[in-house]
Amino acid sequence: MSASLAGLERKLGYTFKNQDQMLLALTHRSYAGRNNERLEFLGDAILNFVAGEALFERFPQAREGQLSRLRARLVKGETLARLARGFDLGDYLRLGSGELKSGGFRRESILADALEALIGAIYLDADMDTARERILAWLADEFEGLTLVDTNKDPKTRLQEFLQSRSCELPRYEVVDIQGEPHCRTFFVECEVVLLNNKSRGQGVSRRIAEQVAAASALIALGVENGND
């Protein structure tokens, strides 16, 4: 085991029994051979479960939609990448030469994916309790600042944060029609989300309101919220 990996283990707060599992978690798909995508898939599922379980216990009065919004904030790519930078994770990644030259070790999505892969690797190397303990320790500061006030953000912000938590492209809004007299117009907007086959629609007395309605419809279509949240 190299000194560099030992240093990373100290930062993570976990020592791997199987070093190959750790190396695989740090291997981007641009690198020759096996990569961390399967571990990332597993780690993402574990992270979402652990975050959801912790929120369920922490906020017993919260509604489903509120819990979903809080979880989206906790597990979004921006948050995970910030944690990864705190571990200097980019210094340990195995990247292909092209990705390395383009600064992939600094890229938010690559850092976030690698952290999820490490979660999956810890689970396989140890057990669920150990993975849970590490996740909660890493996210302790994030949990400390959470309140239900955070769920009062507008639908566009909530949709954006949800998509970021899934490393998806941001939604695109388009005004498709404007009806009525200049002093009493109704704006019709479509919202395109990569996870949905159909565009969500909204209307309102201003473009901003119509976009908010379309975003709210998209959240419902995604199953993140329901009409009562």
From Swiss-Prot:
It catalyses: Endonucleolytic cleavage to 5'-phosphomonoester. The keyword Glycoprotein does not apply. Its cofactor is Mg(2+). The active site is at D44, E116. GO terms for cellular component: cytoplasm. CDD domains: DSRM_RNAse_III_family, RIBOc. Residues 154-224 form the DRBM domain. The keyword rRNA processing applies. GO terms for biological process: mRNA processing; regulation of gene expression; rRNA processing; tRNA processing. GO terms for molecular function: double-stranded RNA binding; metal ion binding; ribonuclease III activity; rRNA binding. Its EC number is 3.1.26.3. Keywords: Cytoplasm, Endonuclease, Hydrolase, Magnesium, Metal-binding, mRNA processing, Nuclease, RNA-binding, rRNA processing, rRNA-binding, tRNA processing. Belongs to the ribonuclease III family. Homodimer. Digests double-stranded RNA. Involved in the processing of primary rRNA transcript to yield the immediate precursors to the large and small rRNAs (23S and 16S). Processes some mRNAs, and tRNAs when they are encoded in the rRNA operon. Processes pre-crRNA and tracrRNA of type II CRISPR loci if present in the organism. This is Ribonuclease 3. The lineage of its organism: Bacteria, Pseudomonadati, Pseudomonadota, Gammaproteobacteria, Pseudomonadales. The gene is rnc.
